[in-house]
Amino acid sequence: MMRSQSKYTSYFFFLILFYFCIISSFLFLFIFLGRGYLNQQYSTITCLPTFKFSTFLLNTISSPQVVKLDEGFAGVKLVGKENFVCSQIHQFSSYKVYIFRVNTKDFGKVFICRFHGNVFHIESICG
């Protein structure tokens, strides 16, 4: 009686291990295919899975100064904040979309933002 019970226990263990391997392989593919999609969309950066920051920095920006730089880049200077360097990637009728690279200790962080009037909506952050 004990032998058959241990047989079913080992069978159950291998079944759980098999499903775990399948689920982790799908997660692996999902993450790296998502990175490839973002790289096609924004070819200059490598994005991790998207984090939403739609209200981040909303109250800290009163009137940003957008200054044109070389090669289509623009610098956005915030009062009392760090400088952002951004590249415009899309132009819509009501808003512009920018990619921001922050000049702080978090070197390499990229902010993808929407610019609407004087308000920047941060859509995602990439590393």
Swiss-Prot record:
Predominant localisation class: membrane
Subcellular location: Membrane
Organism: Saccharomyces cerevisiae (strain ATCC 204508 / S288c) (Baker's yeast)
Membrane topology value: Single-pass membrane protein
Note: Almost completely overlaps RNP1.
Protein name: Putative uncharacterized protein YLL047W
Record GO cellular component, one term: membrane
Sorted UniProt keywords: Membrane, Transmembrane, Transmembrane helix
Ranges annotated as spanning the membrane: 12-32
Biological classification of the source: Eukaryota, Fungi, Dikarya, Ascomycota, Saccharomycotina
Domain of life of the organism encoding this protein: Eukaryota
